[in-house]
């Protein structure tokens, strides 16, 4: 490197360092100002903090994996809202915060726990030393939003190393916009899109001394329900990750996010189905099917395979119900959360696998699922779960891809295999719901309606070809036209069917 290039590199490096120092100083000033009153209200920056805390703290703790007897590192521990709770069952808790008065207050409240220790330290400091592979759970609540993008990326690299294989990282952040009502002269907080955090943590990995590679696997990402319930606010989002060996299989979620429901694909589907929708007929079929549910204000609805949230917003806004939307695709839920901004409706979203997720018995009034269960191999087990989760008198409504009785053609069999679908004929599908315990089961073949919807959607895409090409390109246009024509052909031939199913508990 010549002298001028070396000098330029040094200037650039100094500029980066100066920017990082400026960031740390701004954050420190901000928290020194907001830590004068060492109260829950000051820490949560909200006048309703005491009431919110009663619901929010148990909810956050309920999302954590078992940490009984384990080592817990709490970053940005504050005055200890969570420190004492963690110390009750953990083997050891190290609580850390970069404001000395705050961590001292935490110690004065929680110092009687002999398994807790307290440290005043900045998580971004290179002087902070934590042994690799020594921690079972890293916990933070409102920390990363006070770090720059570069600081978040660096911290993730370090956290993956600190964590044991099989250990977990849980964090919760304010995304998109401010939540608390405290007045702030200056606000250096970074209100990011959730997908920033998802991307940075997905890219986090470590290689140990033996050359074994490990990475982070997303277990869940969801809104904090207490904020949805009390503030109609979906911007409080938490994530739970697990450190796994890089060879461990997570193929289905990867298939959904990298193949079938990659970001460009979702935007294409939304263009075809209408804003907020990625399933057959968009708002039109949603209105028709939701009307069959006789929803009442205050009821609770579970949407399995919620996609990007259009049906959930429709139900919440038009029927005043509380909707929980779950989807295995991280990309889908990211879009749903973005669509929720400013809507002020009671809808919460979560990245979750409906085959492993559990809810208490008798939780929901309605379980709703649109063109999703075709991905599920063990439908009888899922329907038994639906039956348990529903309140007595509750309803399930499902639309789904089906097939005609008999052996499928080679082409249709190849399509089913490529997509990983599990398809049944309409009658068998209805029988599975009956076998799970549902009464008054309606199992309707709606293939004629499916064909009309497909024809209308295809005609609309072809009519607006120039706009579509400008926004997406020829390859995406060809994929949609080819895909819709193939569905029309399979359905016209009677092989692919579309079913509507309703059952009552």
UniProtKB/Swiss-Prot annotation:
Family label: Belongs to the class I-like SAM-binding methyltransferase superfamily. PEAMT family.
Give the main EC class.
transferase
Annotated N-methylethanolamine phosphate binding sites: 260-261, 269, 401, 415, 419-421, 487
Binding of phosphocholine, residues: 174, 179-180, 184, 191, 269, 401, 415, 419, 421, 487
Q: Which gene is annotated as encoding this protein in its UniProt record?
A: PEAMT2
The chain's coiled-coil residues are: none
Q: What is its EC number?
A: 2.1.1.103
> Keyword set for this entry?
Methyltransferase, Transferase
Q: In which pathway does it act?
A: Phospholipid metabolism; phosphatidylcholine biosynthesis; phosphocholine from phosphoethanolamine: step 1/1
Locate the transmembrane regions by residue number: none
Function noted in UniProt: Involved in phosphocholine biosynthesis. Catalyzes the N-methylation of phosphoethanolamine, phosphomonomethylethanolamine and phosphodimethylethanolamine, the three methylation steps required to convert phosphoethanolamine to phosphocholine (PC).
The residues that hold S-adenosyl-L-homocysteine are 76, 81, 97, 122-123, 141, 278-279, 305, 327, 353-354, 370
CDD domains, per database record: AdoMet_MTases
Reactions listed under catalytic activity: phosphoethanolamine + S-adenosyl-L-methionine = N-methylethanolamine phosphate + S-adenosyl-L-homocysteine + H(+); N-methylethanolamine phosphate + S-adenosyl-L-methionine = N,N-dimethylethanolamine phosphate + S-adenosyl-L-homocysteine + H(+); N,N-dimethylethanolamine phosphate + S-adenosyl-L-methionine = phosphocholine + S-adenosyl-L-homocysteine + H(+)
According to UniProt, the name of this protein is Phosphoethanolamine N-methyltransferase
């Amino acid at each position: 490197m010549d002298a001028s290039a070396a000098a330029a590199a040094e200037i650039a490096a100094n500029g980066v360092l100066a920017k990082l120092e400026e960031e740390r100083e701004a954050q420190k000033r901000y928290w020194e100002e907001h830590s004068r009153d060492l109260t829950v209200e000051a820490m949560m920056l909200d006048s309703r903090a005491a009431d919110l805390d009663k619901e929010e703290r148990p909810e956050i703790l309920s999302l954590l994996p078992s940490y009984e007897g384990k080592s817990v590192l709490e970053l940005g521990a504050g005055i200890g809202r969570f420190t004492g709770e963690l110390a009750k069952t953990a083997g050891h808790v190290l609580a850390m915060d970069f404001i000395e008065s705050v961590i001292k207050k935490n110690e004065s409240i929680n110092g009687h726990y002999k398994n807790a220790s307290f440290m005043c330290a900045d998580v971004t400091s290179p002087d902070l030393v934590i042994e690799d592979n020594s921690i079972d759970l890293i916990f933070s609540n409102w920390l990363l939003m006070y770090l720059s993008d570069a600081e978040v990326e660096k911290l993730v690299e370090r956290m993956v190393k600190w964590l044991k294989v099989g250990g977990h990282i849980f964090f919760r952040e304010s995304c998109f916009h401010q939540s608390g009502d405290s007045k702030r002269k200056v606000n250096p907080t970074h209100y990011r899109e959730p997908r920033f955090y998802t991307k940075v943590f997905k890219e986090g990995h470590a290689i140990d001394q033996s050359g074994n590679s490990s990475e982070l696997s997303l277990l869940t990402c969801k809104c904090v329900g207490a904020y949805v319930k009390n503030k109609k606010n979906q911007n409080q989002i938490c994530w739970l990750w697990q450190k796994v060996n890089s060879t461990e299989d997570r193929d289905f979620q990867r298939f959904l996010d990298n193949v079938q429901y990659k970001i460009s694909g979702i935007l294409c589907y939304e263009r075809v189905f209408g804003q907020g929708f990625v399933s057959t007929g968009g708002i039109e079929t949603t209105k028709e099917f939701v009307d069959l549910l006789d929803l009442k204000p205050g009821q609770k609805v579970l949407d399995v395979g919620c996609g990007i949230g259009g049906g959930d917003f429709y139900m919440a806004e038009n029927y005043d119900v509380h909707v929980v939307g779950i989807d295995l695709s991280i990309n889908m839920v990211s879009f749903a959360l973005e669509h929720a901004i400013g809507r002020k409706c009671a809808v919460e979203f979560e990245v979750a696998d409906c085959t492993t997720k559990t809810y208490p018995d008798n939780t929901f009034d309605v379980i709703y699922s649109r063109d999703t269960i075709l991905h599920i191999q063990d439908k009888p087990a899922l329907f038994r779960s639906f039956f348990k989760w529903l309140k007595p008198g509750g309803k399930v409504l499902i639309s789904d891809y089906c097939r005609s009785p008999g052996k499928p053609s080679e082409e249709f069999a190849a399509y089913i295999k490529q997509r990983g679908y599990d398809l049944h004929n309409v009658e068998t599908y209805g029988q599975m719901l009956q076998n799970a315990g549902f009464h008054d089961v309606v199992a309707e073949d709606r293939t004629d309606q499916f064909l009309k919807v497909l024809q209308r959607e295809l005609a609309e895409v072809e009519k607006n070809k120039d706009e579509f090409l400008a926004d997406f390109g020829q390859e995406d246009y060809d994929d949609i036209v080819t895909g819709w024509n193939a569905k029309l052909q399979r359905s016209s031939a009677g092989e692919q069917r579309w079913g509507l199913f309703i059952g009552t508990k």
